[in-house]
Amino acid sequence: MKALILIIGDDPILLRTRAELLRDWQITTVNSRDAGEALRLRPYDLVILSQTVQETQARRLIAQALELDPNPRILAIRSGDDRQLGSLTYQVDLNNPGGLRSAVARILDHEVIASAR
């Protein structure tokens, strides 16, 4: 079964581009305003926070994800000068071409390996 990934962002073009880049997985895209509801509706294997989500909103969404799942897998896309969102998130730099796809594969593969132990 394909992993379920929620991509949260406030730029529709970036959301479509990222969904296409990650088409090997089952993707849902949503803006940050509607992300809380999307998180409540179903569990996701990975939540991706775009750099278009303001840091305060990203922190709120991370807190909400923690309420719903004690071990959420969250990937934050950040430009090199952004502050970290905390140790609960994986981070990928926009300056690395193909970095998003490889980071997602690495995170999801790690979870499969960990659950098989």
Short names for language-model regions:
Residues A3-I5:
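Conserved hydrophobic helix-helix packing surfaces used for dimerization/oligomerization
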Residues G9-V30:
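Two-component/phosphorelay signaling modules centered on CheY-like receiver
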Residues D11-L14, P43-T52, R83-D93:
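Conserved N-terminal glycine/acidic-rich loop preference
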Residues R18-L22, A38-L41, G80-T89:
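Short loop/helix-cap segments at secondary-structure boundaries that form the rim of catalytic
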Residues T29-L46:
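Acidic, metal-coordinating helix/loop segments flanking the phosphotransfer/catalytic sites
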Residues N31, L75-R117:
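Output/docking surface of receiver
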Residues P43, E67-L75:
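His-Asp phosphorelay/catalytic-motif detector in bacterial-type signaling
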Residues L49-D69, S79:
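Conserved phosphotransfer microenvironments
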